[in-house]
Amino acid sequence: MQKLTILGATGSIGASTLKVVEQNPELFSIVALAASTNVEKMVALCRKWQPKYAVMADKAAALALQSELASVSPSTEVLGGVDALCHVSALEEVDSVMAAIVGAAGLLPTMAAVKAGKRVLLANKEALVMSGQLFIDAVEEHGAELLPVDSEHNAIFQCLPQQVQTSLGRCNLEEHGISSILLTGSGGPFRYTDIAELEKVTPAQAIAHPNWSMGPKISVDSATMMNKGLEYIEAKWLFNAAREQLKVIIHPQSVIHSMVQYRDGSVLAQMGEPDMATPIALTMSYPSRVDAGVKPLDVTQVGELTFLQPDFARYPCLKLAIDACYEGQHATTALNAANEVAVDAFLNNRLGFTDIARINESVLNKITASHKSENVNSLESLIELDRMSRTIALEFLRERS
């Protein structure tokens, strides 16, 4: 029986994780559920799952949850704040931690799980984007097991030999005959929209993803392809890939979730229904496979598969992320912070869709002019740079309004 902490239990990844647990009750049990602010959803989850711990990142939300749970799940201990998130990520009785808190907020609890030597099911891409080498070094130092949940990284993982799967972050692709990794992305809902029309895009249009069901932040990132940019940075760290070994391909149907090209001319691809329960189930049961409750892909119904080069004029955020990836850790940390601020402003109708890239670029330029990667060599310095980048992004926002 594998015991789980789920960080981000009220989100879409949390829901898919619980779907896999429900499908395999003899294999998995829930120790702790954690979320940010959604008390109503957390009450429903605690009523159903009766976890030992329920944690809210927001302390006021934790107090509200505590009074709600007194009658429906009295044995559940309610905790609040970032320290509490870190505590349930490092509990001795926990085997695996699903790290699915969106954004920079997920970094500290994910790192706590790593330092406790847990099996870390990594759905929070920002942890690697923000802390890269520090994160990879901590995984090795503390004997944690890192398994990628993101559908693309999970697809790549499945197409790699076992020696690479068990040495993520420090593997040598060339040694194993791998020539390149092809990271696929749908191109989002605006891949055929006239570029001149993009500045009129509304939040409602941007969060309507054609293939995947995701939260609002990730849906907007998919529309700008910043999501693919962050995944590119994550792939660079997970698979220790050089720039020439990592390519982004637009694949509108989202049937192939990514591919690996080998030296002998072979290309291995992972296919499946666009359902996050599949990669989640693999990380939970690796190296075995369990029933994820996902209908099998009917390949006769797929029709044609299309592959295109990304157009950086349409997706400037993707280009910013790829360039930041090889500029250094200071650049990716700053870009991630700026993007979180810009997307939040867009979702709240305070910023235009095409201005997201402009804010991101302005912050990136300002930080790279004053910082180098060697300036960010500790978790504390990364968190300070993240804070500084957000402040600069907010200043640029005020100037625009």
UniProtKB/Swiss-Prot annotation:
Q: Which InterPro entries match?
A: DXP_reductoisomerase, DXP_reductoisomerase_C, DXP_reductoisomerase_N, DXPR_C, DXPR_C_sf, NAD(P)-bd_dom_sf
Q: Key word Metal-binding present in the record?
A: yes
Give the residues the record marks as binding 1-deoxy-D-xylulose 5-phosphate.
Answer: K125, S151, E152, S186, H209, S222, N227, K228, E231
Record Pfam families: DXP_redisom_C, DXP_reductoisom, DXPR_C
Q: Which GO terms describe its biological process?
A: isopentenyl diphosphate biosynthetic process, methylerythritol 4-phosphate pathway involved in terpenoid biosynthetic process
Which protein family is named in the record?
Answer: Belongs to the DXR family.
The name on file for this protein is 1-deoxy-D-xylulose 5-phosphate reductoisomerase
Q: Which organism is it from?
A: Vibrio campbellii (strain ATCC BAA-1116)
Question: Upper taxonomic classification of the species?
Answer: Bacteria, Pseudomonadati, Pseudomonadota, Gammaproteobacteria, Vibrionales
